[in-house]
Amino acid sequence: MNDAIAWLAKQQEPMQDLLRSLVDTDSNSYDKAGVDAVGAHLIAALEQGGIEVQRTAVEGFGDLLLAELPGGSQPPVLLLGHRDTVFPKGTAPARGYTTDGTLAFGPGVADMKGGLVLNCFALLALQRLAPLPFPVRVLFTGDEEIGSGTARDHIEQVAQGVQAVLNTEPGRVSGNVVSARKGGVRLLIEVTGRAAHSGVNHADGASAIEALARKVVKLHALTDYGRGITANVGLMSGGTSSNTVAPAATAELDIRFVEVAQWAAIKAAIVAIVEEQEVPGTQAVLTECAVFMPMEGRHSLDLLDIYRGQALELGFSVEGEFTGGCADSGFTASLGIPTLCGLGPVGGKVHTDREYLELDTLVPRAQALVGTILQLAKRGQS
């Protein structure tokens, strides 16, 4: 057992202490002060260990934080983690971190404050073996839960030239890691029509609701389960009163797909549907609100084998799992970079008031993460 793995074996209590601090700090995606406060805890933990953190200011959202262990000339390894959660400000004071000794509970405990802890302790452990044959970077972002609008370009920039990306989103309930994810796009459709009294001069109106309803039927027809494509309009609103022909209507569309190459054709079909004027006197506008690219597993088969081997050496087994959920790992995987996700501690019921994390997975998952990085180092030297 090398020094880094052995050191991690003694870090259960410090890891839980940091986890408690993070969970007890509100960090909704739109709460910049809260997301930055979580960042302050991470900065303190790393700087106490002698690791500097670079901050890139972001207006309106959490700043971007980058820490790096210097290394040799081999391509770097990048770790990812997001500091924001879906829970509104005030959740942590109302129901903060608790534990029954086996499980930890609290807002974002699994998604993904447990993963942030792993990233910190992985870097601190690897520092004990420095210098490595390559730099190891950790990027902490602040708006993943709402689409990574401020983070995507930075993620892709920092990932340029890296040999692998390891994202510590929560491990699956099964204990598995994530080897493939769907891509997802959220779109806003805004339809305008012409108001009229529904009894006095109905024919003078142009119903935005009718036009939108016709589009929804066509949009839902884009679903193709055999190809892994789904279309879902989950929100609709419109009109001013029941006796007025609706002058406006809006809908939010969620699209999921499994291959990067699918998106261009899907988008073209959506644009054609939105632009079609089914009801004379109406028009529609389409806006992309959030875009996550899919994480295709074919890029990461070797990386998954390395992680599985490290897990077995530590006494637990994992497989790669596919999920329909999206994550920042899709951005790097779509660039062809070997990427694994779901490497964080095992947890479940995320985004609910019953979210939990299995405390006894903190150390072994951190060890497997570090072991994977060290195995990449050995492979590069062979």
Cite the ranges covered by each PLM segment.
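Short beta-strand segments
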Residues: 80-81, 139-141, 166-169, 190-192, ...
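Acidic/histidine-rich catalytic neighborhood of metal-dependent amide-processing enzymes
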Residues: 112-182, 381-382
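Short glycine-aspartate micro-motif
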Residues: 76-78, 104, 163-167, 188, ...
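Glycine/serine-rich anion-binding loops at beta->alpha junctions
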Residues: 87, 102-118, 197
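Acidic/His- and Gly-rich active-site-bordering loop/insert found
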Residues: 2-107, 128, 132
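Metal-dependent amide/peptide-bond hydrolase catalytic core
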Residues: 1-3, 27, 50, 54-57, ...
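A structural signal for isolated positions on well-ordered beta-strands in alpha/beta enzyme cores
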Residues: 78, 135-139, 285
